[in-house]
Amino acid sequence: KKGGNIIFVTPTQRRRFDDATHSRIQETHGDYPDAMRAVAKREDVPVIELHDMTRTFFETLGYENSKKSLVHYPANTYPNQTKALEDNTHFNPYGAYEVAKMVVMGMKQLNLPIVKYLRADWKDFNPAQPDDFNQFVWYPSVNQDVTKPDGN
């Protein structure tokens, strides 16, 4: 009744590279992405393929540089953060910004009606050509807290 539209979005990859060459992302979601695609096809629901795009993104950045898109920070980067953070699942601001661009590209590829609301200066994004991490600027909030909602 409210005019909403269902869109499936496959999960982002985790940063888990193969042990031998550290060049290929390994699957960590099992059958889940394929199950999503099957349900979407059966129900005629559009699917944004973050699963494939984030694999390309991580593999393009490579084993070491891909850490720059995730919550990988040495101890004492933030107040009250006494231990190093090495989270291969959750994106930092740079990574989240890149993933947001992937979502927009997915919407464009599907030609979803919402794309008409994109800014006129939007520039298309290719996860095989990510933005330079060293050029990315995100100013931390003065009210930052590294405590997880369920505690640390």
Regions found by a protein language model. Name each.
Residues K1, D19-E27, A84-Y94:
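Second-shell loop/turn segments in exported
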Residues N5, T12-F17, D52-F57, M105:
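Solvent-exposed loop/turn segments at secondary-structure junctions
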Residues G4-T10, P46-E49, H90:
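Structural recognition of the beta-strand scaffold that forms the well-ordered cores
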Residues F8, D34, G106-L110:
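Long, non-globular segments of proteins
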Residues Y63-N152:
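Conserved catalytic region of serine esterases and O-acyltransferases that act on ester linkages
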Residues I48, D52-N65:
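Short, solvent-exposed beta-strand-terminating loops
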Residues T12-D19, T77-Q81:
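Short, conserved helix/loop micro-motifs enriched in His/Cys and acidic residues
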Residues R14-M53:
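Substrate-gating cap/lid alpha-helix
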